[in-house]
Each structure stands twice: as structure tokens, then as C-alpha cells.
Design a protein with these regions (language model features):
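Catalytic His-Asp segment of secreted/periplasmic serine-dependent ester chemistry enzymes
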Residues: 219-299
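N-terminal secretory targeting modules
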Residues: 1-110, 119, 123-124
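Alpha/beta-hydrolase-fold catalytic nucleophile elbow
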Residues: 176, 214-215
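Second-shell loop/turn segments in exported
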Residues: 148-152, 180-189, 202, 227-234, ...
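A short helix->loop->beta-strand "cap" motif at the edges of active sites that frequently abuts
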Residues: 206-210
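Conserved SGNH/GDSL esterase-like catalytic core that processes O-acyl groups on lipids
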Residues: 101-193
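Generic structural signal for well-ordered alpha-helices
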Residues: 195-199, 241
């Protein structure tokens, strides 16, 4: 009898232990389910909040529009659906500042241009804006601006870009950087990060100045086939310009779509505007560029 009682005690103990484990598992499943439901609710709230802010990549909105720009547009902003993705990117062509009453070239006497050799052309050619102020340096990107690198101007003088720009005290700043650092077909995340930081630094140094972000200019189709310029192809430049347009809106800057006047029907740099290298621009191209700038201001 004692053996039976011991055996029964062991069986009951095992049964109760098994039942305890089952109950504990059920409780754990219920807890995890509750946590999952709570996470979904909170996550949905964060997504909804994000959709009300300026973001570079965003879920499709109910009417497929994006109306967060700080200036009037000729048409509603639409977004592009990214291939094999539910996310979308802002179309830089739709985010551009619309045409305005043209200003005289003399208006740019109180304006500064920040850029690389493409901007130096604006300074050097008579068809550009030689009467404006410039912080233009061959071969630079936004990282040189952020890091306070000493840069050499077209006349050979070396200076720190932000210091030089601040000393000019312009009423507006026009920025065009990217062609020199995007030639390699690599990830451009760091370029965008530096670009954001650069705009922040300009805004802090010149709080009253309006900032115009110019799109990276188009190139001839053969440029992207060259090993040292594989990243300068039409499709990639469009994606980067989408990002720059979103950054401009995020930073309360104005975005200018230079492709309106420099690109042909295929989205390539107009052949008659192209220098032999396929991405630098001839004087007649600068004339069209200047006409566009004169008719796209916030004055």
C-alpha cells in the first residue's frame, strides 16, 4: 500500500506539474499576443505621425499626394512608387519651385553660389553670373564644407568655405554639389548625410538667407559607361535628385530643377550644351541656366 501511495503521489505530482506548465505556456502566449497587439497599435500611430512630416521615403498616402512644401506649386506633388517596394520617393520634378516673375541679373549681386567646377563656370563665363558672389572649388563635395577643409578658388586663393560664405553675408545662397563625389557607383548615404549637415550649417551661419538647392545637373548618356563615372547615369541621378528635393523641403529650402532647361527629352544633358567630357557645360548652357534662375525666385 505504501508503494501504491508513493506511486500515486508521483503520478499526481507529474500531472499537476504538466498542468502548471500548460497553464504557464497559455498565459505566456496570451501575454505575447497582447504585447503584439499593443505594438501594432503604437507602430501604426508612429507611421501616421511620420506621414504628416517631411520624410524621404514614405508609405503611399490615400490620395497619392504630398503637400508639405513651404511654397506654392504649379501642381500637386506626387510620389513615385519604388520598384519591388511598397515605399515611395518624392519626384524631384514635382517638388521644384514654380516659375515666377523674372528678376534682373543685377539681383544676384547679393547672392552667393556654393559649388564645385560646374559653379565655377557660372563665375567665369560671361553668360553666367560673374557679378554674383561665389564659394566654388574644383573637385569638392558637401563633406569638404562640413569638415572645414581648406579649398582653392578658381583664382588660386585658399579659404574655408563656410567662413568665406559667412563673410559674404548674402541674402540668398544657391547650392550645387555632388557630381564630383557621385561618380563612383557606390552607396550615396554619406553624401546625403553631409548634404543635410551642410544645409544646417548654412542656415545657422546665415539665418536670414534663403537657401536654394539646385538639382544635380544631367549628363550625356556615355558618361555613365566610363569606369570612373559609373555613378553618373540618368536613373541614378534622378534617384539622388529625389532625395535632395526631399531634403530641401525638410530643411525649409527651395528646390530648383535644372533639368527643365539643361536636359533633352530623354533626360540627358542637351548635346549642344555639353563639353567634350559630357558633364561640364558650355557657355550657351549657362545662358539657359541663368534664364531659369532669373525666373525661379521667391522674390
Amino acid at each position: 500500500m505504501a508503494d501504491y501511495q508513493e506511486y500515486r503521489r508521483r503520478i499526481l505530482h507529474r500531472r499537476w506539474r504538466r498542468m502548471f506548465i500548460i497553464v504557464a505556456l497559455l498565459a505566456l502566449v496570451a501575454l505575447l499576443s497582447a504585447i503584439g497587439i499593443l505594438w501594432k497599435v503604437l507602430h501604426r500611430e508612429r507611421v501616421d505621425t511620420a506621414l504628416s512630416q517631411n520624410t524621404i521615403l514614405r508609405q503611399v498616402t490615400t490620395d497619392n499626394t504630398w503637400n508639405t512644401v513651404n511654397y506654392p506649386l504649379a501642381r500637386q506633388l506626387r510620389v513615385q512608387t519604388l520598384e519591388d517596394s511598397t515605399e515611395t520617393a518624392l519626384d524631384f520634378r514635382m517638388a521644384a519651385l514654380p516659375a515666377s516673375a523674372p528678376v534682373e541679373k543685377s539681383w544676384f549681386a547679393q547672392v552667393s553660389f556654393v559649388g564645385d567646377s560646374l559653379t565655377q563656370g557660372m563665375q567665369i563665363y560671361d553668360t553666367g553670373l560673374p557679378g554674383a558672389q561665389f564659394c566654388a572649388y574644383k573637385g569638392v563635395g558637401p563633406n569638404a564644407f562640413v569638415n572645414g577643409t581648406s579649398c582653392k578658388r578658381a583664382d588660386g586663393v585658399t579659404e574655408i568655405p563656410l567662413d568665406a560664405l559667412t563673410a559674404q553675408q548674402p541674402k540668398a545662397v544657391y547650392v550645387l554639389l555632388g557630381s564630383n563625389v557621385l561618380g563612383r557607383d557606390t552607396d550615396y548615404t554619406s553624401f546625403l548625410t553631409y548634404y543635410r549637415l551642410m544645409l544646417d550649417m548654412i542656415s545657422q551661419a546665415l539665418p536670414d538667407a534663403k537657401i536654394y538647392v539646385q538639382s544635380i545637373t544631367p549628363v550625356r548618356p556615355e558618361v555613365g559607361t566610363q569606369a570612373n563615372h559609373a555613378g553618373l547615369n540618368r536613373d541614378r541621378l534622378c534617384r539622388i535628385n529625389n532625395e535632395l528635393a526631399a531634403i530641401a523641403l525638410e530643411k525649409n529650402c527651395y528646390f530648383l530643377n535644372l533639368w527643365e532647361v539643361l536636359a533633352d527629352e530623354n533626360g540627358d544633358l542637351i548635346e549642344s550644351y555639353a563639353q567634350p567630357d559630357g558633364y561640364h557645360i558650355k557657355p550657351e548652357g549657362y545662358a539657359a541656366w541663368v534664364d531659369y534662375l532669373c525666373s525661379h525666385t521667391m522674390e
